[in-house]
Amino acid sequence: MKPGIHPEYREVVFQDIGADFSFLTRSTIAAKETIKWTDGKEYPLVKIEVSSQSHPFYTGKQKILDTAGRVEKFRQKYGM
């Protein structure tokens, strides 16, 4: 590998601001803020709006649309 062209791969804390949930993982993303983690070390912090703790698919609060009913209404309305 060529030296100096690859991004730094390091441990980063991602914080879901909607669900008050944080997790530590590795990433190459640039971060301006830092946070002290539970192990006492300081890590770069990236704030995100959606994670598995707040996304409706993972939380079970997903709305299921009745697409078949909508198609039938459309066909009845326009005589198809």
Curated annotation (Swiss-Prot):
Belongs to the bacterial ribosomal protein bL31 family. Type B subfamily. GO terms for molecular function: structural constituent of ribosome. GO terms for cellular component: ribonucleoprotein complex; ribosome. Keywords: Ribonucleoprotein, Ribosomal protein. The keyword Metal-binding does not apply. Part of the 50S ribosomal subunit. PANTHER family: 50S RIBOSOMAL PROTEIN L31, CHLOROPLASTIC, LARGE RIBOSOMAL SUBUNIT PROTEIN BL31C. Gene3D superfamilies: Ribosomal protein L31. InterPro entries: Ribosomal_bL28/bL31-like_sf (IPR034704), Ribosomal_bL31 (IPR002150), Ribosomal_bL31_B (IPR027493), Ribosomal_bL31_sf (IPR042105). This is Large ribosomal subunit protein bL31B. HAMAP family: Ribosomal_bL31_2. NCBIfam families: L31, PRK01678.1. GO terms for biological process: translation. It comes from Methylobacillus flagellatus (strain ATCC 51484 / DSM 6875 / VKM B-1610 / KT).
